[in-house]
């Protein structure tokens, strides 16, 4: 990064990120630092304050636009936060702040995509909150409740369905 | 799906009906056409075109359809779906709403079952394993057991050792490997005329259980060792709390005498007696290994060194003797005390002994050398604790003294008790001392405080002598000659629970597991308590002679075994040690 102009405050860089489906999201420089993958990508591809305006958006081919928008929103909210230590014990003592609890109160499909994205983009804070959210869905539940919450058949039901499909295939 | 199949069957089986449905479809189609023209007045020409093009197509299908196709498709449903596809998203939503209003609850429930999976995700099966592990990392062992029952995939992920290893110390309590406890005295049981063990397994079930006990490492251990460890620890806890007692034994010795002291180290049990001897027993084999002969007076106190190599005993003959656990040989006789050796404590190979001669002496048991004499008490020393540097002693002079073991200097004298001090606890890390006295009170001291201000709590409520105490964190458990167990918060200085049930003096106490305390009593019983709920869990041993002289003098325990020293002062009960087994195998 170049030195800021002496007489004017440095403008913060805003990066454009293009997702797998062609949707463009924006993230500030500070927000991007929450993601080790994005930070490395920006550095390796040579995006700078001088050339950012003239270059194509940063390509992230593993994440769709809807999910990337959520990621960007989370990173902007937490851009001033320290990145949590890479330590399993952090997870045990972690409590999810209220804003994040609301942010993560989304459908399973969206939460699933968000956790995958946080893993790919190496956003530890979001990954921990996402995993903790799923943990909290499972905590203190009976086996039957777990199946109902996560939409999982018993192995017997799966076996019966497979048998039925095989029988149907033979008839056809 | 099923109702639709049903309709199909009806359709296919009635040839005369084939014509009527066609007629019905035509009528319904006209109705829908009318509706369409109402809701889309501006595009009536388009609808008219649709109508004219659809009609011939439907007609063609009707004429050319084979009987099997007729069975597969319900023309009315197909028409409905075709119309539905032509609707806008908003129109579809309106149609859904109105269809639901026309549906019965059975169909609505089936509809929910079809829809719900669209909103659910099987996270553990679909996420990368390392993320699944992060999710499971937050769960308790109990939760993990439930997770394992959900599906094959969940079971595989839930059994990854790293997840179980990460459980906290509270959950992942380590026990020594499973024991045999089927030979020697274990071949019988402790159940006998005059001895009741209320929840003991029936004799006819013992042989099967003994066989199963020897299968020490099961299937789960082979594929998920740490889960197996968790399950075993959980089983052991249940064995103490609720399960039938699956094994017991009687160690007979010290006939017609009192067992005055008892210690356990790993698999070694040492009992001392006023018959002038100590016996060294192998717990798992259920047999005596050595009888330590040499004292010329009753043995009143003993210790096993932390390394397990030395047994030390104190006697009315004024001597301290050091014995080898390897072969029971006498290594040293330590002389110097001028009266009964009444109490002792060890740290490493350094021993501190307290005596009726009012002094404490410091020894090295390896070399047999006398290192220091601590003068200061004005009456018998009754109890002592030692952390390797600091000695804490309580005496019949009503005081508790703090000493430096190396210099022999008395650092502090704690005054406040107005009768003899009988029991002590010392927690070195916090400089906390708890003392129990015949004045009925328990005092909690912090001797780093300014002189005269050391007493941080005065615990009152007991009405007699406190015979034993144990402290964890801020919770102190005390047992007393008044027949009660009390649970205290030493930070608040309050009594949290009073546990009643014994009918005479409590002689000993053992705290194991998270919240379980066992107590022995002059009333001839051993009771197990839950000190968190403040309730009796169950009686473990009951002597018929209780109340007539039979008593339980002392308890010792490991995490899987309880030893009870039994006897009487009037020969109504033979002297023996009853062992109860609470062990379990790795599933």
Swiss-Prot record, chain B:
GO BP annotations listed: cell differentiation; female sex differentiation; negative regulation of centrosome duplication; negative regulation of Notch signaling pathway; regulation of Notch signaling pathway; regulation of protein stability; regulation of vulval development
Stretches forming WD repeats: 253-291, 294-333, 336-373, 376-415, 416-455, 461-498, 501-539
Tissues in which the protein is found: Expressed in tail and head neurons.
Region (Disordered): 1-53
Domain called F-box: residue spans: 121-167
InterPro entries: F-box-like_dom_sf, F-box_dom, G-protein_beta_WD-40_rep, WD40/YVTN_repeat-like_dom_sf, WD40_repeat_CS, WD40_repeat_dom_sf, WD40_rpt
GO terms, molecular function: protein homodimerization activity; protein kinase binding
Feature: compositional bias, Acidic residues: 17-34
Highest taxon, organism lineage: Eukaryota
Gene disruption: observed consequences: Worms show a weak masculinization phenotype. Moreover sel-10 mutants suppress the egg laying defective (egl) phenotype of the sel-12 mutants. RNAi-mediated knockdown results in increased zyg-1 expression at centrosomes.
Cross-referenced PROSITE patterns: FBOX, WD_REPEATS_1, WD_REPEATS_2, WD_REPEATS_REGION
UniProt feature, compositional bias: Low complexity: 35-47
Biased composition (Basic and acidic residues): 1-11
Function summary: Probable substrate recognition component of SCF (SKP1-CUL-F-box protein) E3 ubiquitin-protein ligase complex, which mediates the ubiquitination and subsequent proteasomal degradation of target proteins. Regulates synapse elimination in early development in the motor neuron HSNL. Cell autonomous negative regulator of lin-12/Notch-mediated signaling, with respect to lin-12 activity in cell fate decisions and tumorigenesis. May target the intracellular domains of lin-12/Notch proteins for ubiquitin-dependent degradation. Involved in sex determination by promoting female development.
Name the UniProt record assigns to this protein: F-box/WD repeat-containing protein sel-10
